[in-house]
């Protein structure tokens, strides 16, 4: 919390469940209370509630259920600007990676964005299979 007060452009949380569990255990809170506290903290910093008055963007890594559903409360879904899923076309070493948005308030939904991490230091991407 004090670290965030400095002000950042972007913060990566890996993973939402892990951080939520840590907050819950450290404070002796219920899961719901810890989640509300985290969401309120993110909302505060998204609205520039920090020393540098930066509108902080948060990237939260969140697991999916075995059925492929979002694991978390509806409040997380509601406060999220965009939800992207990293997936594979095919199986094995040659399966192509892609990103697909299931929710995106500022762009398209449902388009597969293929990407490659094979060239060190570069991320290549395309809307068509490479």
Model-derived regions, located:
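Conserved P-loop NTPase
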Residues: 88-130
């Amino acid at each position: 919390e004090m670290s965030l007060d400095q002000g950042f452009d972007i913060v990566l949380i890996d993973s939402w469940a892990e951080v939520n569990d840590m907050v819950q255990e450290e404070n002796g809170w219920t899961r719901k209370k810890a989640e509300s506290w985290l969401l309120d903290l993110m909302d505060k910093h998204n609205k520039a509630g920090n020393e540098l008055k930066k509108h902080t963007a948060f990237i939260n890594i969140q697991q999916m259920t075995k059925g492929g559903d979002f694991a978390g409360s509806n409040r997380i879904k509601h406060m999220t600007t965009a939800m992207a899923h990293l997936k594979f076309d095919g199986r094995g070493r040659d399966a192509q990676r892609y990103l697909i948005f299931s929710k995106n308030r500022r762009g398209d939904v449902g388009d597969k964005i293929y990407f490659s991490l094979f060239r060190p230091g570069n991320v290549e991407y395309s809307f068509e299979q490479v």
